[in-house]
């Protein structure tokens, strides 16, 4: 209820700021040196308030759903407080007007996401939480390095122009890659599915994974980026979109398919930023947040019906047992595909038009187009499994409570209407394209070709062993977990209260000293070839721009 009231208040503030076209900066001076003032700065403009409205709206729906989903959990009160802290950290990051405030929200997101992913007491949840934490720590180091570069060059600790210091722009971009799960930092995103489903709905829609995209959008609005950064972001975004779609096409875990679709859409947003279209990326972020939250809430209802079964081969014929849930999921899938007259159509289709209209790299454009084709294919595949697949699990009948209805129906309405609604509210989201009819026919052909392939293709047992293993995420996930393996053992001993703190810390420091070296000694022959090819592709992409 409180989040709903805050959402309404922020909505009114957004309308006032949008009509006045004004911004406000609130600063609290912490301390000063001879040349630098360290301030806690909060910026309130139409971008930050609109994104905060989206976060609070989705959070209120997720909390309403979690009240029923976690009702039988013995520690649901603790879960609720951690989730509130997670939303508060995201709010601080959204309103941050300086790098000092940004670090406060960034660290808060990292710590609370660690606690939420490790909520269930098992090895899979603990290892996934450590993987997420270590990836975010890499981003923390890069943000602090950016902070140091800005201080050395004599700039302010507020967001400086992005092109002013080339080194700081590189560090800040790579830090955003870690938070937005761009390749090669994508390993933690599927692993975060070990968290409860309400956490997944909040993380994958509007909070943790979109934080990096939002920060880059905020910097792009101050000033553009160096030309080299556009090439790098285009290459990384197209690779992320392509790899996320290719793995989701052969995955049988329901939640992982949805997580990999998030990975694919994050690549779309990054590619939009590489075209210097920050407002269009923000519009796609808003639409994606709505239908992805509804998609995860629908998956949570399916898990409640099937007693926790996530294998798509055991689920099927849900169209007859729970037509309302499947109808809402199908709406989400149509939004994911960019079907006409839904929210993502007004952003995703326009991104593709601008890509064809602008002088873009041919190599990255083809990868991005192929990733878009795979998006429609795995969406149709998921709909086929859930609606018309063989029912081998005998799920119970789903009688949706009022809490489930109140949490999903507003998201369903906004998933369809948010794209056109945001264009009406703010003309900044309107981007015109002068592409020819031939280009439009190509885009429509890609959409309907993906639907056709998704309907007619049959997937054998050979493909999952090759593609759904996510072998391209192996280096980062294996080595980060290898680094924290000793931490998992010592945490278990601390929980059992069978060790003295001094003994734990001495062994921990001894083990971590050589574990750090293992991070740099993992280049075996096959991985050396993989990284050589990746570096070669990046160099060729920059040269061909």
Curated annotation (Swiss-Prot):
Mitochondrion found in the keyword field: yes
Membrane topology note: Multi-pass membrane protein
Keywords assigned: Electron transport, Membrane, Mitochondrion, Mitochondrion inner membrane, NAD, Respiratory chain, Translocase, Transmembrane, Transmembrane helix, Transport, Ubiquinone
Intracellular or extracellular location(s): Mitochondrion inner membrane
Transmembrane segments: 1-21, 47-67, 79-99, 100-120, 141-161, 162-178, 195-217, 230-250, 263-283, 285-305, 322-342, 360-380, 406-426, 442-462, 525-545
GO molecular function, one term: NADH dehydrogenase (ubiquinone) activity
GO biological process: ATP synthesis coupled electron transport; electron transport coupled proton transport
Keyword Protein biosynthesis: no
Gene Ontology, cellular component aspect: mitochondrial inner membrane
Pfam families, alphabetized: Proton_antipo_M, Proton_antipo_N
Domain of life, per lineage: Eukaryota
Summary of the function given for this chain in its UniProt record: Core subunit of the mitochondrial membrane respiratory chain NADH dehydrogenase (Complex I) that is believed to belong to the minimal assembly required for catalysis. Complex I functions in the transfer of electrons from NADH to the respiratory chain. The immediate electron acceptor for the enzyme is believed to be ubiquinone.
Similarity-based family: Belongs to the complex I subunit 5 family.
Protein name: NADH-ubiquinone oxidoreductase chain 5
Organism: Albinaria caerulea (Land snail)
Phylogenetic lineage: Eukaryota, Metazoa, Spiralia, Lophotrochozoa, Mollusca
